[in-house]
Amino acid sequence: MAETTASGYIQHHLQNLTFGQLPNGGWGFAHTAAEAKEMGFWAFHVDTLGWSVALGLIFVLLFRMAAKKATSGQPGALQNFVEVLVEFVDGSVKDSFHGRSPVIAPLALTIFVWVFLMNAVDLVPVDWVPQLAILISGDHHIPFRAVSTTDPNATLGMAFSVFALIIFYSIKVKGLGGFIGELTLHPFGSKNIFVQALLIPVNFLLEFVTLIAKPISLALRLFGNMYAGELVFILIAVMFGSGLLWLSGLGVVLQWAWAVFHILIITLQAFIFMMLTIVYLSMAHEENH
């Protein structure tokens, strides 16, 4: 495979199916990264939205099916799996969340399963989903990205949703005055009112950076790990297309080895996203941090 062809292959697999306003004023899909960039802020990543919604529906339907078939007698395989998963998440919440809220455990379960399913799509061979999109659309230049968590828009969207909950519960539990005081009166304090007033800008700067770093680090950690994993799969696929027998053979070994290792990564990243969400919301429920 020539270098330019390999470069084009990689760029094509890392480009989202973007829908937005074209330079001619009409609306349609971008075929190149340059066209997608020209669409601006109001462009939609159709593949990211489609996969995330579809996998969310699969999660809801599977758990609804398990709930409807739940029995106190001999449970089926699906019921056993769901019960183990629910107990695992519930135990994680009890260990890490020190407030009282009926929302946190269901939220943690939703985050873990949903993020895991989106990550797990990365185990599908990199060419299958894009080729299926080409067959359906009939357009050989159309890009299609299957792993939603390799799109920073998806991870940032989830992270800032968690951030909104952090702000909501901080104000609900501590009151607006308590929340503002948390941002302005900590970590430095003084009994002297004048000195305390001088420390308010310093405290606010430190606390604001700490606060805004939570969703950004939450999003970029998931995105970075999944993007790197997807890129490795794509580079291995380039080996298969090299035309060299020894590279193709090496690609088979690497594909299998990386897929096995990647199972740990996709599970761990879903777990970390869930646990950090629980910890951040626990901090929001504390009177003093």
Swiss-Prot record:
One GO BP: proton motive force-driven plasma membrane ATP synthesis
Gene Ontology molecular function terms on file: proton-transporting ATP synthase activity, rotational mechanism
Protein's membrane topology: Multi-pass membrane protein
Chief location category: membrane
InterPro entries given in the database record: ATP_syn_F0_a_bact/chloroplast, ATP_synth_F0_asu, ATP_synth_F0_asu_AS, F0_ATP_A_sf
Key words of the record: ATP synthesis, Cell inner membrane, Cell membrane, CF(0), Hydrogen ion transport, Ion transport, Membrane, Transmembrane, Transmembrane helix, Transport
Pfam families: ATP-synt_A (PF00119)
PROSITE patterns linked to this entry: ATPASE_A
Domain of life the protein comes from: Bacteria
Localization of this protein: Cell inner membrane
Residue ranges crossing the lipid bilayer per the database entry: 43-63, 103-123, 160-180, 193-213, 232-252, 259-279
CDD domains referenced in this protein's UniProt entry, alphabetically: ATP-synt_Fo_a_6
GO annotation, cellular component aspect: plasma membrane; proton-transporting ATP synthase complex
PANTHER family attached to this UniProt entry: ATP SYNTHASE SUBUNIT A, CHLOROPLASTIC
Oligomer and partners: F-type ATPases have 2 components, CF(1) - the catalytic core - and CF(0) - the membrane proton channel. CF(1) has five subunits: alpha(3), beta(3), gamma(1), delta(1), epsilon(1). CF(0) has three main subunits: a(1), b(2) and c(9-12). The alpha and beta chains form an alternating ring which encloses part of the gamma chain. CF(1) is attached to CF(0) by a central stalk formed by the gamma and epsilon chains, while a peripheral stalk is formed by the delta and b chains.
Purpose: Key component of the proton channel; it plays a direct role in the translocation of protons across the membrane.
Protein family according to the UniProt entry: Belongs to the ATPase A chain family.
Name assigned to this protein: ATP synthase subunit a
Species of provenance: Pseudomonas fluorescens (strain Pf0-1)
